[in-house]
Design a protein with these regions (language model features):
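Phosphate-group recognition and catalysis centered on beta-loop-alpha active-site segments
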Residues: 1-586
Length: 586
């Protein structure tokens, strides 16, 4: 009786089928190949890697740019005339695109690791191209609308560089397995040497990268200065409508030590608080004065301005997704807000022993108060009941007519040297965070210059400026900064040097070990492709019987197909197998 034995037993390769199936729609074993990938597929792999790096950069940009989302929406509003949170579709598309490209890249790396031929499915090729082109168009659009925001990338590295360095080092170390497997192959080529050289350069650059870092929070904790004072920029605009009394009150409730407001002069000489050039976004002027909704806000008189509602827009548009957190009483109060006058805000500052930072928009030349706007502002300051001592705490921003307002603290938002500030009688400086380098901050603080940095809405940026010694920051989110009792991370120089050097040494040791292991593995093992099977009669005696049985079964099936009932015999002669009909003989 002949015992049947399978001609060939295939081991199930579920994971390989999953990888090749999703990446290239090669679900069956016969569809796969372990040959070298074509140049066309290698080019697509490069495109995939480039898309991943671009999306990684794009995602990181929007992660750190959260600090300025309000400014971005305001810029878009000034261009389109419609107020919408434009960051939501951008963040959603970036998340989807980055997840998709990352998943495909992981599958491609598994292909390389498993020795499978790359073959990206045509649907994925369309998806990769669409994602790449969409991201490029997004980068171009942001550069056009919001080009100065790229500076936040360099600023953020002051906080994230040590951690990005560790992550990048771990990634490059892991990739060494694939690089080593490619380089130590028997076939030598110039491309292999180029890949090896590029890898070594990247690895060494990462190891030495911390020499270029400037991280204010790498310092002795005993040298840390008190936390910067928080100025409520237009109050607390994330919790209540900007530049309204309820917004300023909320800012003070959340620990703001000062208030900042945007001042516009009405046609009858009354200073009021308004950020935009028109009243469309933050009032119901389109309902009350539909024919004047695009008119400059300064050409309305105070009676007309006071008749407008300045809170309902906040409840309807919910610009910061915070309306749901408000109580019914708070919503009712916000819904009844009117445009705030400068005098009201200054009286609130006087009652709470707070100072004020005023950003005054000079009226256009055809405005009736064009030549007397500063006198109107001074009149409101004096009328608010603030004593002469308290008047000095009110900051005067415009550079014009400084000699006529010596009673107020002189400031500028232009970056000047200490000597030039002294010559112009300026004692205070308000700078955008992108213009306030660590070196500049140290110089201003050492010369007793009152420095305020804006806008600071995220804990990481607040921590950097705290470690740098900035005395005060202007923020749209005092409720967020209130929850930062200490810098989010602080490390001594010695501790960081230890972490840096240790991580570099561990990485180098692992990379060298991987290259040595791959070299030993390649030189000590014979690589056979298990899917290529050749039946040969000239085999070792230990496997001869198995091969004979396989051949018997093959010819038995052939004979059965021809209708023959004779028994299959095998006669070996001179080491070869001879087949005949009849009995089985030796």
């Amino acid at each position: 009786m002949v015992k049947h034995q399978p001609l060939q037993v295939y081991e199930k390769q579920v994971f390989v089928s999953f990888v090749t199936g999703i990446y290239g729609c090669r679900w069956k074993r016969y569809q796969r190949s372990q040959d070298d990938s074509s140049r066309w597929e290698c080019a697509w792999f490069i495109i995939l890697c480039s898309s991943f790096l671009l999306l990684l950069f794009w995602a990181y940009f929007w992660l750190v740019a959260q600090n300025d989302f309000n400014d971005f929406n305001w810029l878009v509003y000034n261009r389109s005339g419609e107020w919408r949170d434009e960051t939501i579709p951008i963040l959603a598309s970036t998340t989807v695109g980055f997840s998709y490209i990352t998943f495909l890249l992981i599958l491609a790396l598994f292909h390389i690791s498993l020795g499978q031929q790359l073959n990206l499915y045509w649907v994925h090729k369309i998806g990769v191209l669409a994602t790449l082109l969409t991201t490029i168009s997004g980068v171009v659009s942001v550069d056009d609308i919001w080009g100065n925001e790229w500076d936040i990338l360099l600023v953020s590295l002051q906080s994230t560089a040590p951690f990005l360095h560790i992550g990048a080092l771990a990634t490059v170390t892991a990739i060494s397995w694939l690089v080593a497997g490619y380089v130590v192959r028997r076939e030598r080529s110039n491309i292999q040497m180029m890949v090896l050289a590029m890898y070594i350069v990247i690895l060494l650059a990462l190891c030495l990268a911390p020499l270029t870092f400037t991280c204010p929070c790498i310092m002795d904790r005993h040298s840390l200065k008190p936390p910067p004072g928080v100025i409520g920029r237009r109050g607390a605009p994330m919790l209540a409508p900007e530049n309204t009394m309820v917004s300023f009150n909320r800012a003070l409730q959340h620990g703001a030590s000062s208030l900042e407001a945007d001042v516009t002069i009405s046609v009858d000489g009354v200073p009021f608080l308004m950020r935009d050039r028109t009243l469309r976004r933050t009032t119901d002027v389109s309902k009350v004065f539909p024919g004047r909704q695009y008119e400059d806000a300064s050409f309305f008189n105070w009676t007309e301005i006071r008749s407008l509602n300045a809170g309902q827009w906040f409840l309807e548009s919910d610009p910061y997704w915070t309306v749901e957190t408000l109580t019914a009483k708070e919503r009712s109060r916000i819904g009844n807000q009117t445009v705030c006058g400068l005098m009201e805000m200054l009286r609130l500052a006087a009652r709470t022993n707070s100072s004020a930072l005023l950003n005054i928009r000079k009226p256009p030349p055809e405005h009736p108060r064009y030549r007397s706007w500063f006198m109107d502002t001074l009149w409101a300051v004096q009328k608010a009941g603030i004593s002469q001592k308290r008047v000095r705490t009110v900051t005067w921003t415009p550079d014009t007519d400084r000699g006529r307002v010596r009673g107020l603290q002189q400031t500028t938002n232009e970056k000047l040297s200490v000597e030039e500030m002294r010559q112009r009688g300026i004692t205070s400086l308000t700078l955008h965070y992108s213009k306030a380098s660590y070196k500049d901050i140290q110089e201003y603080v050492a010369n007793n210059v009152s420095l305020t940095v804006y806008p600071v809405n995220e804990p990481w940026l607040y921590s950097i400026l705290w470690c740098s010694g900035v005395p005060s920051v202007s923020s749209d989110a005092p409720q967020v900064l209130r929850k930062v009792p200490y810098p989010i991370w602080l490390m001594s120089q010695n501790a960081y040097n230890f972490i840096w050097i240790t991580s570099d040494l561990v990485s180098l040791a692992v990379v060298i070990g991987i290259f040595c292991f791959q070299k030993w593995k390649m030189s000590g093992l014979q690589n056979y492709n298990p899917e290529q099977i050749m039946l040969s009669a000239v085999t070792r005696r230990t496997s001869r019987d198995v091969n004979i049985m396989k051949e018997k079964l093959i010819f038995s099936e052939l004979n059965n197909g021809l209708g023959s009932t004779e028994e299959l015999s095998l006669y070996p002669e001179n080491g070869y197998a001879i087949y005949s009909h009849g009995g089985l003989g030796r």
